[in-house]
Amino acid sequence: MNLKKILSAILVLFLACSITSLSADARWFEKYSSFVPSNAVGENEVWVGTFQLVWNDFQDKIVKAPVKFEEGTPKLVDELNRQPFSSSMLSDNSYFKAYGEKSLELKEEIENGLMEKFGEKSAIIDSIDWTSGQGYVVYAMLKKEFKYLSAFPEIEAAPFYGSGESVRYFWIDKNTSNPTLYQNVDVLFYNSANSYAIKLKTKEGEEIILYRTDDNKSFDDLYSAVMKKQKRFWFGKKELGEQDLLKVPYIKFSKQFSYDELCNKKIVGTNGLFIDKAIQTVEFGLDNQGGNLKSEAMVISTMSLIRRDGGREFFFDKPFVLFMKEANQDRPYFALKVKNSDLLEKVSKQ
């Protein structure tokens, strides 16, 4: 069964802001498409802010003006030019950026910077020739690792939304022997057995928002819906009660995306500069203890030479959306729609 039939929407937001940010004015999200570029993974969808970080520096430091193409500018470029996400919405210890003329010296700066800050090596910088041609490279890495306040127990593997294969889940049931688990979870709203959202809290101040919905809408519309519904749930029970149930699937995937629609088009006012390559990677994992996110992005430009017992059930075993944000920020840096089990961690066959 495809991912669309399994998860109609998953938004994972790590936002550096408190939950009060969800009640902020939602009209900003409706005016522009702010989760760009959004990437299809089968019938699932993922967004992370890393490419926007790279684009911001490409626009501000290299082109030094809004990017326009001589042969016509696509909508994606106009949306990126608005810079709806920036490094000011992230803590300094969660990202690394570098830009400059393409050279072995810049490559070494990136390698040393990543190792010093994250103890990481890049998976993409060796994909280009650093010695040929005139041009520029803009690079960024976003990295997050987080642990829940308490680790959740794992439940027996089960299918996701009718899929033919079982996936792993963690959960809280009404007979849990660890009452501290409830401190991991805030209820944002519960409107019905098919419309609810929760927030998972972490030791590092990251917030994972899980929204159960079948709506096939944009991340902007989905996040706006969470904010509006949470604001209206002022009378509801905000804590997970002893009769409430929670079930969340493990998530694990690694993908690379290329944005060919941005490439090989001369940029206005640059004497022939064009984007030669625009790429982004996403690695994401979520399990019963916490999770991790690592994403790289790079733009290379070149000069032309030419429910139970009355309790509620918060089960994320059907289409859902996931957002990730820092607790003191009001913009997410990661979003994910899960429609099937393609991105979920499978049970090994014995």
What does each model-identified segment do?
Residues 1-10:
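Bacterial N-terminal signal peptides that target proteins for export
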